[in-house]
Design a protein with these regions (language model features):
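Alpha/propeptide regions of enzymes that mature by internal proteolysis
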Residues: 126-128, 132, 296-299, 307
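Zymogen propeptides
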Residues: 22-186
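Active-site-adjacent helix-turn-beta-strand microarchitecture at beta-sheet edges
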Residues: 139-245
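Short acidic-glycine loop/turn motifs at beta-strand connectors
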Residues: 99-101, 174-180, 218-220, 258-263, ...
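Bacterial N-terminal signal peptides that target proteins for export
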Residues: 1-8
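Conserved, well-ordered active-site substructure
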Residues: 140-165, 232-293, 297, 306-368
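C-terminal motif of bacterial Sec signal peptides marking the signal peptidase cleavage site
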Residues: 15-18
């Protein structure tokens, strides 16, 4: 009997030990995880050069071609004249900065079915600053106070014998006509049909909406620098080809930009006068804005002969046009506003503040 008991103990003892070990709570705890370093690069797992611009406030100071003028509390006017470091050419640039955090001001989008000129908008609205707005109505989506005034009606942009596929609505400006202004790359990589569908949906909830192109800066990414690379030239002799329009020809430019600290920039660059202001491409304008103002968002608007800015107390003493519209540089220039005809005389003693073009849309700042 003793031998049998000893035998059973020898057989069962290892089993008891095994069971006891398995019942130990500490043995079921998994090993600690291997530490993982968080990736700061966002969804793509990458960082970008433009991320270094976040949190930086950049503004020009007086000197080096810049003149800085305080217009009112929260509104500053900048004028540059000289050789720009980006384009390596002579330029005249005009910028009005409005602090949207200041509740004393409203920023508004105006639409005139019979068109208007910036100086008349300035006087009729008692504005502090006015700037021309969007492209021709057939090329943009425009919603005013919830009513659609333009719906990208044209599939093509006609210029002489050329019909260029529509390209002027890749991005948009959304406003409440007070202090909420947003610049978004809404139509990025979309077809024309998708633009129409997307903006029609947006117009149901957005009170004021206007499209334009190209987007210049999208959350600090300088997308305007590569616009022409993404749009290879198709019609090299047509000024409405997007590559020609934005890249291979330098023109007067108008842009709207917004900084990370919620300041809005009206931007106009003169052009078509090589010895005074050559004009600028979309890529050059993008770099110029990054270097001098570091906006978080920026969008190109209608430029060329349309580019015009008025600022209170600046420029022409009667009209307050600060830049030098180029339409009357070579000959008299005639415009029509409704049933009225205006003839701007040809420049006789160098650039003047006349030659405004009549256009349908404007941005302006007013004091409440």
């Amino acid at each position: 009997m003793n031998f049998k008991r000893l035998y059973l103990l020898l057989v069962l003892f290892p089993l008891v030990l095994a069971c006891t070990k398995g019942d130990d709570p500490g043995s079921s705890v998994p090993p600690p995880p291997t530490p993982v370093t968080p990736d700061p690069g966002g969804d793509s797992g990458e960082t970008h050069p433009w991320d270094a611009n976040r949190g930086k406030v950049v503004r020009p100071q007086n000197g080096n071609g810049w003149t800085v003028t305080k217009i009112d509390d929260g509104i500053t006017y900048y004028a540059f004249e000289g050789t720009d470091a980006v384009s390596k050419a002579k330029q005249r640039v005009f910028v009005t900065e409005t602090d949207l955090n200041n509740t004393s001001y409203s920023v508004k989008l105006a639409y005139y079915s019979d068109r208007n000129i910036a100086s008349r908008v300035f006087s009729s609205t008692n504005a502090i600053a006015v700037m021309n707005g969007g492209y021709e109505r057939g090329s943009i989506w425009l919603t005013m106070a919830g009513v659609n005034k333009a719906t990208i009606a044209n599939d093509y942009i006609t210029s002489g014998d050329y019909k260029v596929p529509q390209w002027k609505s890749e991005a948009a400006i959304y406003m409440d006509n007070d202090r909420d202004v947003r610049i978004e790359y809404t139509g990025k990589d979309m077809t024309l049909a998708q633009w129409r569908t997307t903006y029609a949906a947006k117009a149901k909830t957005e009170k004021y909406l206007m499209t334009s192109a190209p987007m210049l800066i999208d959350d600090f990414e300088p997308v305007g620098e590569t616009y022409t690379q993404r749009h290879p030239v198709q019609y090299p002799k047509c000024s409405e080809d997007p590559n020609v329009h934005q890249g291979s020809t330098t023109n007067p430019r108008t842009a709207l930009a917004k900084t990370e600290d919620n300041h809005l920039l009206f931007v106009v660059v003169d052009g078509r006068r090589d010895n005074i202001s050559r004009g600028i491409s979309a890529s050059e304008l993008t770099q110029f804005l990054v270097n001098n103002f570091n906006p978080q968002y920026a969008i190109n608007l209608d430029g060329g002969g349309s580019s015009t800015m008025c600022v209170a107390g600046q420029g022409d003493p009667n009209t307050h046009v600060v830049n030098y519209p180029c339409n009357n540089r070579n000959a008299d220039y005639t415009i029509t506003i409704g049933s009225e005809t205006i003839v701007w005389p040809k420049e006789t003693h160098g650039p003047d503040h006349l030659g405004e073009r009549a256009v349908p849309t404007f941005f302006y700042v007013v004091k409440k």
